[in-house]
Amino acid sequence: MADGDSGSERGGSSGGPSGFSQHMSREQETQELASKRLDIQNKRFYLDVKQNAKGRFIKIAEVGAGGSKSRLTLSMAVAAEFRDYLGDFIEHYAQLGPSSPEQIAQASGEDGAGGPGGPRRALKSEFLVRENRKYYLDLKENQRGRFLRIRQTINRGPGFSGGTGGGPGLQSGQTIALPAQGLIEFRDALAKLIDDYGGEDDEGMGLGSGASGGGAGGGGMYGELPEGTSITVDSKRFFFDVGSNKYGVFLRVSEVKPSYRNSITVPLKAWGKFGGAFCRYSEEMKEIQERQRDKMYDRRGPGERGGSLGPGAGGGGDDSETEDVDDD
């Protein structure tokens, strides 16, 4: 995808020559690092990793059968949260049984409208807030099947004339609909791009308008958050990332191996308990290891211990050592 296509949601329709020149300048400064195409049912999805002076970010575009396009823009930090949320939706979708005809009819045409435009029953919903951006995730169904609807809205602020409707400073939202059968493929492709191009230096969003993801200064309504970090043990790497959503502040701990990735999310109110549990187990394991070393030492014969345990053993050496100390 060309930068001109994937960057069009960043206020390209701003009025006046100066707005156009600023838009073109931003486009020229943006580099595309990687692109992945997914064909799911009759739709095409593009995942593009881009970079500008503010950092790296991911653009997601849906191209329908008629060529219509919808785009979302995610910081690397928000993309990581999306990846984990997708895992939750995948698990929920796998537990759902088949829909009955009555449920499908109710989901698609409660008001008699029928067809794809009618109301749709939400099976699971989540949302994220990142300063001037909001992301809504809804697992829904209609007569064509189940799908994940992802909607992004951007508040440009009172001083921005976006020219896209919705009131002063408010840009109309962008929405993509991902067929449920493609959730795993989409999640895996996103995870691969994050693994290959994400990093500690990409916590900020390269999106302009003061938006930022997790990490210091990116806590949205919660203000500044601690920086993420990582540790490497053998072939594993553990990432610690602090974020926030509608439920509050949380710590996401991700375990990453070359062919495996898993994560847990710990709410802020449980950090102290988790820390206390880790410290307690660390101390207990130290005591267990010391007892095991003592038992192994006791099993050894006098010769294996160095021959200097008994009261008379090595006495000459002890006297010599004492004399040296006295001489000093």
Curated annotation (Swiss-Prot):
GO BP field: positive regulation of transcription by RNA polymerase II; regulation of transcription by RNA polymerase II
Record GO terms (molecular function): DNA-binding transcription factor activity, RNA polymerase II-specific; DNA-binding transcription repressor activity, RNA polymerase II-specific; purine-rich negative regulatory element binding; RNA polymerase II transcription regulatory region sequence-specific DNA binding
Feature: compositional bias, Basic and acidic residues: 24-35, 289-303
Location(s) in or outside the cell: Nucleus
Keyword Aminoacyl-tRNA synthetase among record annotations: no
Gly residues bias (residue ranges): 9-18, 304-317
InterPro entries xref list: PUR-bd_fam (IPR006628)
Modified residues (N-acetylalanine): A2
Sequence segments annotated as region (Disordered): 1-35, 100-124, 289-328
Keyword set, alphabetical order: Acetylation, Activator, DNA-binding, Nucleus, Repressor, Transcription, Transcription regulation
Predominant localisation class: nucleus
Ranges for region DNA-binding: 27-260
Acidic residues bias: start-end ranges: 318-328
One term under GO cellular component: nucleus
UniProt function note: Transcriptional regulator which can act as an activator or a repressor.
Family: Belongs to the PUR DNA-binding protein family.
The name this protein goes by in its record: Transcriptional regulator protein Pur-beta-B
Organism: Xenopus laevis (African clawed frog)
Lineage: Eukaryota, Metazoa, Chordata, Craniata, Vertebrata
